[in-house]
């Protein structure tokens, strides 16, 4: 089955196989994010054990001795990333100044042009009758 589309990224007819292939090609950032998070696990466990409070270490030791590994995992997850606070001299003034000057930032900007070509209206040269399932942003 083919589908007619007047998009700038898919001129002419496009098969479902081509659309599926393009969607699979967009998985690579997600896969990279998942792998990066998985690779953090050993270091996170080491940090939790090496830099833990004595009470957390006692809880891990007790629950591991009685064989309750679910509670060991719960203790590790509950106290992951718990660190002491750091007070920076002048930090509040710096944050206030940064938020005040942030009001004058231009922010995100996209030039949008409405173009009439041969009686057909386009936004940035992408046809308005394009099938939205192709995720062109329009």
From Swiss-Prot:
Record site feature (Cleavage), residues: 84-85
Topology Lumenal: residue spans: 1-59, 81-138
Residue runs in coiled coils: none
Pfam families in alphabetical order: HCV_env, HCV_NS1
Isomerase as UniProt keyword: no
Keywords: Clathrin-mediated endocytosis of virus by host, Fusion of virus membrane with host endosomal membrane, Fusion of virus membrane with host membrane, Glycoprotein, Host endoplasmic reticulum, Host lipid droplet, Host membrane, Host-virus interaction, Membrane, Transmembrane, Transmembrane helix, Viral attachment to host cell, Viral envelope protein, Viral penetration into host cytoplasm, Virion, Virus endocytosis by host, Virus entry into host cell
Keyword Glycoprotein: yes
One annotated GO biological process: clathrin-dependent endocytosis of virus by host cell
GO cellular-component term (any): host cell lipid droplet
Positions of region (HVR1): 85-111
Sugar attachment sites: 6, 118, 124, 131
Transmembrane annotation, as ranges: 60-80
Family, per entry: Belongs to the hepacivirus polyprotein family.
Comment field (misc): Viral particle assembly takes place at the surface of ER-derived membranes in close proximity to lipid droplets. NS2 associates with E1/E2 glycoproteins, NS3 and NS5A, which interacts with the viral RNA and core protein to promote genome encapsidation. The nucleocapsid buds at the ER membrane where E1/E2 glycoproteins are anchored and afterward associate with nascent lipid droplet to acquire APOE and APOC. Secretion of viral particles is probably regulated by viroporin p7.
The name this protein goes by in its record: Genome polyprotein
Source organism of this protein record: Hepatitis C virus (isolate EC10) (HCV)
């Amino acid at each position: 089955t083919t589908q007619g589309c007047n998009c700038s990224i898919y001129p002419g007819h496009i098969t479902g196989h081509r659309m599926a292939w393009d969607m699979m090609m967009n998985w690579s950032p997600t896969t990279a994010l998942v792998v990066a998070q998985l690779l953090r696990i050993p270091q996170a466990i080491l940090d939790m054990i090496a830099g833990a409070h004595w009470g957390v270490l006692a809880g891990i030791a007790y629950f591991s001795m009685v064989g309750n590994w679910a509670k060991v995992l719960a203790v590790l997850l509950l106290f992951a990333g718990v660190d002491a606070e750091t007070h920076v001299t002048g930090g509040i003034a710096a944050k206030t100044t940064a938020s005040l000057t942030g009001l004058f930032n231009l922010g995100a900007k996209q030039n949008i042009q409405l173009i009439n070509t041969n009686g057909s209206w386009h936004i940035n040269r992408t046809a308005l009758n394009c099938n939205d399932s192709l995720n062109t942003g329009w």
